[in-house]
Every structure is written in structure tokens, then in C-alpha cells.
Design a protein with these regions (language model features):
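His/acidic metal-ligating clusters that form di-metal
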Residues: 113-139
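Metal-dependent phosphoester-hydrolase catalytic domains
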Residues: 19, 124-134, 144-233
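Metal-dependent phosphoester/phosphodiester hydrolase catalytic core
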Residues: 92-117
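Extracytoplasmic/secreted cell-surface and envelope-processing proteins
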Residues: 20-24, 48-51, 67-68, 107-110, ...
Length: 233
């Protein structure tokens, strides 16, 4: 995993089961790459009684500045199986709020679509929370393609929200082939003009799907590239 992560300046992580596991990853990054890495983990795990996970971020200290935590989305309506979590960062001149969400999988797409339809509330919460910051990125495993109609409420928002990663790119790893396009990063076309339009996923499988999903991850990391020489807030 460290060999894959080293390609990025800042990485959002989900399905972090223990803080100790994250610490081991950061130690590996510091040992095997030419950069010094730091991390931030959510103060507690979220999920169900049977399964909970942390959200986390890791970054290159010479490239990225961690500004502050925005905390969890206050899910008073119980809309999400795992409340999304946000934190503020700066890379070069570009500062932004990076929100992570790991959506429900559930028993049917109906459950997943119900969460996706409410994602606009998460965007609006973090957008309204910090009056000085307009760049809100929402990344994660949404267990749906960004083409799905359930994201229509997000796309219809006045801030012109778009997906950053082409949904035709499959990001989940099956036993014998790539399976689904579940991972993406949503952002505002209106505000985040720093987005270059370049994005994708790093395929580390070498077609060894079963081995890699068991030893590394069953998801490919997705990414967007932004211009860090400007900030339009």
C-alpha cells in the first residue's frame, strides 16, 4: 500500500480499523519513500454495532499543511450509516476542505441511493460551516457510480457540483477482473477552478486481482490534480 500512496501528496483513507494500523502505514511510508509523512485520524470510529471504522488522512509534510479538523457531519436525521468527516488543508496556495464518506452497501441499491440523494446536505453543511472557504471536496467509496440518478440532487445544487473522476473507470477489484465504479471525488465547478480536469485511478493490480484485493485493497485509489499556484477563495 505504501508504494501506491507515495504517488500522492494527500490521501484520504477509509476502512481504517485501528489507529495502530494507520501508524504502521505511516512508518512504512517514512521508511520506504523519500518523504516525511504525517497523518490525522477521526477522533472515534463510526458505523454499526457490528462494524466500525475510522476516517483518516496521510500527507507529505513538505507539500501539505493540515489546518484544522471540521469534525463529523452532525447526522441528526440518521441519514448515513457512517457520518462523513471533514478536515481543512493547504497545498501551495490552494486551501480546501476535504470530506470523506464511506457509503452504505446494504442489501440493495435502494439503500445506497437513499444515502447518495442526501449527500448534498453534507456538501451544504461543510460549505456553510466555513464562510472563508468555498472549496469543498467530497471523496470516498459511494457504492454507486457517479452516473447514478441518485446524485441528481448534488448535481443540481447552485454551486455546480461535478464528479472529478470519470465514472467509466472501474475502481473496485473483483476476484477475476475490475468490477465497479464506486469511488469518486465531488467538487464545485463554480468555486474549485483550481481543478485541472485531470484525474483517474492508479491500477496497482497487474491483473493479479485476487492477490491484490486480499493483500493490498479491493479498491483502486482515485485522484484529481489541482493547480496549487492559485487560490480563488
Amino acid at each position: 500500500m505504501a508504494k501506491t500512496i507515495e504517488h500522492f501528496d494527500l490521501v484520504g483513507l477509509e476502512e481504517v480499523i485501528t489507529p495502530e494500523g494507520l501508524e504502521r502505514l505511516v512508518k512504512s511510508l517514512n521508511k520506504y519513500t523519500n518523504h516525511t509523512w504525517d497523518y490525522h485520524i477521526s477522533p472515534f470510529p463510526v458505523g454499526t454495532r457490528k462494524y466500525k471504522e475510522y476516517y483518516a488522512y496521510v500527507w507529505k509534510k513538505d507539500r501539505v499543511t493540515f489546518l484544522s479538523s471540521e469534525g463529523f457531519y452532525p447526522d441528526r436525521e440518521k441519514l448515513f450509516i457512517r457520518e462523513p468527516y471533514g478536515a481543512n488543508f493547504q497545498i501551495g496556495k490552494f486551501d480546501f476542505t476535504f470530506v470523506l464518506q464511506h457509503a452504505v452497501y446494504g442489501k440493495s441499491e435502494t439503500e445506497r441511493r437513499a444515502e447518495a440523494f442526501q449527500l448534498v446536505k453534507v456538501y451544504r453543511y461543510f460549505q456553510d460551516r466555513n464562510k472563508k472557504e468555498n472549496d469543498i471536496l467530497i471523496g470516498g467509496d459511494f457504492n454507486l457510480s457517479a452516473f447514478d440518478e441518485a446524485f441528481s440532487s448534488l448535481y443540481e445544487d447552485k454551486d455546480q457540483i461535478i464528479y472529478g473522476v470519470d465514472p467509466r473507470i472501474k475502481t473496485t477489484i473483483g476476484m477475476k477482473k475490475m468490477a465497479n465504479s464506486y469511488d469518486n471525488i465531488f467538487l464545485s465547478k463554480k468555486y474549485t477552478e483550481e481543478f485541472t480536469g485531470k484525474s483517474g485511478a492508479i491500477d496497482f493490480t497487474n491483473r493479479q486481482y485476487k492477490v491484490m484485493r486480499n493483500k493490498v485493497s479491493d479498491h483502486l485509489p482515485v485522484f484529481i490534480i489541482v493547480n496549487i499556484d492559485r487560490d480563488d477563495d
